Amino acid sequence: MTAEDIVQNVFLKLFEKLDTINDFGSIRFWLLKTARNEVYGYFRRAKNHKEEALEENEELLTDTNLGREIEEKEAQEIVRNEIDLLPTELREIFVLREYSELSYEEISQMVGVSKEIVKSRLFSIRQKLIKNVSKRIGV
């Protein structure tokens, strides 16, 4: 699933729910919230289908770049695991900024804290992730 698939799913859901939305000013918020939920769902499914993905990619074993690809996938998995370990509110802020690419202002409105708190929490999250990932990969 790609980012385009996620966006398509969000707009399909909007189309299905269009008749139930009374305030068209809230569509932007609804879209952001639905996109966030789709991204979370993507990560849940990716985590659940990890073994299936490995089976589907057995042909990679003959690839000359296998070592590098395995290291990259392992690093991505470590980062995903560390993100999953974050408290829900911090994980939400991180995902909204890094994966959904929302502005600090948009995130602050969605989670109900000031823009400065969002910036501060993102700084702390990034520092924590760097520290924990570095420990796990032995850097």
For every predicted segment, state its role:
Residues 19-23, 33-54, 72, 124:
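Arg/Lys-rich amphipathic alpha helix in sigma70-family domain 2
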Residues 49-76, 103:
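Internal acidic/polar
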Residues 1-9, 17-25, 137-139:
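Short, charged helix-capping/linker segments at alpha-helix termini
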Residues 93-97:
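A short pre-motif secondary-structure segment
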Residues 36, 105, 110-135:
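DNA-recognition helix of helix-turn-helix
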Residues 17, 42, 89, 110, ...:
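Residue cluster at the C-terminal edge of the helix-turn-helix DNA-binding motif
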Residues 78-86:
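Short amphipathic alpha-helical boundary/capping segments
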